[in-house]
Regions:
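Catalytic nucleophile loop
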Residues: 33-36, 59-78
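Catalytic-core regions built around general acid/base machinery
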Residues: 49-62
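C-terminal and late-domain segments of enzyme folds
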Residues: 81, 85-166
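Alpha-helix C-terminal capping/helix-to-coil transition sites in glycosyltransferase folds
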Residues: 27-28, 61, 98
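Glycine/threonine-rich flexible loop motifs
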Residues: 39-49, 114-117
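Short, active-site-adjacent cap segments at secondary-structure transitions
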Residues: 40, 72-75, 151-153
Length: 166
């Protein structure tokens, strides 16, 4: 899957699972890419393997970081604005804190419509906007809803929406 979907052919992508020591893999990386998956499982693994601090250290030193989906969630102060199911509970919800706001990846406004046989039916659950409002009932950190396929470049405490909508 990695070889088929990785768009940057001139950059070799090596999974952390291919290393005997994940800490050393991060410490010696020339770039950090964290893909999608379940944010609870990812956050759990980062804490269990004691990778939060070393990731912060290498990224703050100037090593580039790119996060997609769950990788975007863990770039935030916490993973509290994920859309994922809690399949495992991490010790903490704190994540990398690379930006001073939360991101809700895969954001879309309004209700969802689901294909049902030949037609579509409205999903009557909460919208992402409603969930973000619920988050703000107990938290003051701003949240950016990042639409599918969008890209934010964050550098030197400044962000720019490069592709898509937020």
């Amino acid at each position: 899957v990695r070889e088929k979907s990785w768009p940057l052919k001139n950059i070799k992508l090596i999974g952390i699972e291919e290393y005997d020591n994940p800490y050393d893999a991060v410490k010696n990386a020339k770039g950090i890419y964290v893909g999608g998956g379940n944010s609870f499982l990812l956050t759990h693994g980062l804490h269990e393997n004691k990778l939060i601090k070393i990731l912060n250290d290498v990224i703050i030193s100037g090593i580039p970081y790119m996060g997609v989906s769950a990788g975007t969630n863990v770039a935030c102060p916490t993973m509290m604005t994920t859309n994922d199911m809690p399949i495992i509970m991490p010790k903490k919800l704190d994540t990398l804190n690379l930006v001073n706001f939360q991101i809700n990846p895969h954001y879309h406004e309004g209700p969802m419509w689901l294909k049902n046989e030949e037609g579509f039916v409205k999903h009557n659950g909460e919208t992402r906007s409603q969930r973000i409002n619920e988050y703000h009932q107990n938290n003051i950190i701003p949240v950016i809803g990042l639409f599918e396929g969008s890209l934010i470049k964050w550098q030197n405490q400044k962000g720019k929406l490069m592709i898509g909508d937020a």
